[in-house]
């Protein structure tokens, strides 16, 4: 077995063990949500009250302040919610997870020729959306595996989107957090993963898994996949200490 495959096998085992404790099979799971009927225009800022296991740490990541001893804090979801990443990273390199330099990408590169020399974020997102079968939960596959199998859920869409963006010289990263989805009557929150691409110095959501719901979804980032090496699963598991336990929708921001 190749070293990469062996390491990936151990990573998957660790991930499965970690999920067994909370009975989660895929990264997409329901978060308890309080949401009275509220009219919020698409793209408008939204006020929410977040309850988390370590609210102070999460609030600091999101650039807001949580009161000492409080278990929840208020947060306004804007157009481009984001958290700061490592300042010394370009988010362009091929890594163990975002491994666009592997041979499994060769057939995909041929299919991407129609995208031109520098595709837009929308083009990449649409390409991944139609390429990956979203009804096949996997569990944080490497980008090269997604390129070969073309199966997965939100995490597979995210890593493949980031890989293709970097392949074209566009800074991209993977974010883990909450997708807050509106049905026109209220909101429901789900654990989610998505890619972000850098445009004019701003990180912008590039979510191929929820392309069809793009007008009705808002994002609450909790952390980045900072470690894209062999220890990526343990890095992601560390975010569980700050996981959002409940979302209460307060209404549109003033």
Where are these regions (language model features)?
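Hydrophobic/aromatic-rich core segments of domains that either
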Residues: 157-244
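Intrinsically disordered, low-complexity N-terminal segments that are enriched in acidic
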Residues: 21-86
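Secondary-structure boundary elements
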Residues: 91-152, 160, 226-228, 238-254
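Generic recognition of flexible, low-complexity loop/linker segments
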Residues: 35-36, 63, 113-114, 149-150, ...
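Non-catalytic surface loops within mature trypsin-like serine protease
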Residues: 52, 77-79, 100, 199, ...
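Positively charged n-region of N-terminal signal peptides that target proteins for export
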Residues: 1-4
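Low-complexity, Gly/Ser/Thr/Pro-rich intrinsically disordered linker/tail segments
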Residues: 26, 30, 43-51, 57, ...
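Bacterial N-terminal signal peptides
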Residues: 7-16
């Amino acid at each position: 077995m190749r070293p990469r495959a062996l390491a990936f096998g151990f990573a998957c085992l660790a991930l499965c063990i970690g999920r067994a404790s909370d009975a989660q099979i895929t990264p997409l799971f329901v978060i308890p949500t309080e949401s009275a009927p509220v009219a919020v225009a698409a793209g408008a800022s939204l006020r929410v009250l977040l309850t988390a296991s370590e609210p102070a740490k999460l609030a600091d990541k999101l650039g807001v302040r949580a009161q000492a001893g409080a278990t929840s804090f208020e947060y306004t979801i804007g157009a481009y919610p984001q958290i700061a990443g490592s300042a010394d990273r370009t988010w362009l390199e091929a890594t163990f997870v975002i491994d666009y330099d592997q041979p499994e990408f060769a057939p995909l590169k041929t299919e991407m020729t129609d995208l031109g020399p520098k595709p837009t974020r929308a083009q990449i997102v649409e390409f991944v959306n139609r390429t990956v079968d979203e009804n096949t939960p996997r569990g944080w596959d490497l980008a090269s595996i997604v390129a070969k199998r073309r199966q997965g859920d939100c995490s597979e869409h995210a890593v493949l989107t980031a890989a293709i963006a970097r392949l074209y010289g566009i800074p991209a990263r993977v974010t883990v957090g909450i997708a807050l989805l509106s049905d026109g009557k209220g909101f429901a929150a789900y654990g989610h993963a998505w890619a972000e691409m850098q445009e004019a110095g701003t990180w912008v959501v590039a979510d191929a898994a929820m392309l069809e719901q793009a007008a009705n979804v808002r994002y609450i980032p909790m952390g980045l996949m900072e470690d894209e090496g062999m220890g990526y699963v343990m890095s992601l598991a560390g975010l569980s200490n700050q996981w959002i336990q409940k979302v209460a929708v307060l209404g549109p921001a003033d």
